[in-house]
From Swiss-Prot:
Encoding gene, per UniProt annotation: fmp521
Transit peptide region: 1-36
Protein name as catalogued: Protein fmp52-1, mitochondrial
Signal peptide start-end: none
Annotated GO biological process: import into nucleus
């Protein structure tokens, strides 16, 4: 049985990760750290402990003090340029907090780290956002977890709480393409619940050492891998 912790639990993918962890028979405990109280499935609330704080500078110490120590730490934490008030602040928040929390998890003894990244992550990219995503990946890999799992989804299909008109239009196209044939969508867009199931399944496999050959330390899942590991019953 795995003890787990999660940040980003109120976002589109993170909320699905939380519900999948709560429903999974191999998960004994779920701790979340967030600015808002997550909307979790009430049926499995006995597994769930929530820490809610607007002061993100306290999150790392909260994570360090968790008992028992989470064996798997999941991060679906992200923000936007608009909500952060510009890219410089977005970088400080998204890169800074992700790396700080990963370091705290490693120092506490967490064995497996699971990150929701992006298909476009590239340290040599022209645009700042994919460079930031790549830098988060590289910095958490350098921490030397027993195993690091990185998911690189394409467009994340599903309903967001906040308004992103351009992204919403593209999600509509993805949804229409998926209704015609899943193959028209799966290569460049994945449903949020599928990404979440893939993250949970891959994290648990990594904890057991059941990872593909050559991915013993770092396991990167692209779009087709996310579809593969996110398929099946919805917990």
């Amino acid at each position: 049985m795995a003890n787990t912790a999660l940040i980003g639990c109120t976002g589109m993918v993170g909320s699905f990760i939380l519900n999948n962890l709560l429903a999974h028979p191999s998960v004994a405990r779920v701790d979340t750290i967030s600015r808002r109280t997550p909307q979790a499935a009430s049926a499995a609330q006995t597994k769930l402990t929530t820490i809610v704080s607007d002061d993100t500078s306290r999150w790392a110490s909260e994570l360090s003090s968790l008992t028992p120590t989470p064996s798997i730490f999941f991060s679906a934490f992200a923000t936007t340029r608009a909500s952060a008030g510009g890219f410089e602040n977005q970088y400080k928040i998204e890169h800074g907090l992700n790396v700080e929390m990963a370091r705290a998890a490693r120092d506490a003894g967490t064995k497996v780290y699971v990150l929701i990244s992006s298909a476009g992550a590239d340290k040599n990219a022209y645009f700042a956002y994919p460079r930031m995503k790549a830098e988060i990946e590289e910095d958490v890999k350098a921490l030397g977890f027993e195993r690091t799992v990185i998911l690189r989804p394409g467009l994340i299909a599903g309903q967001r709480e906040e308004s992103r008109p351009m992204e919403a239009a593209i999600r509509c196209i993805a949804g229409f393409a998926g209704k015609i044939h899943s193959g028209l969508k799966d290569g460049w867009a994945q449903e949020a619940d599928v990404i979440a199931r893939a993250a949970v399944n891959a994290g648990l496999k990594a904890l057991e050492g059941d990872v593909p050959t050559g991915s013993e330390k770092v396991w990167v899942l692209g779009g087709s891998d996310i579809i593969k590991y996110g398929a099946g019953s919805k917990n």
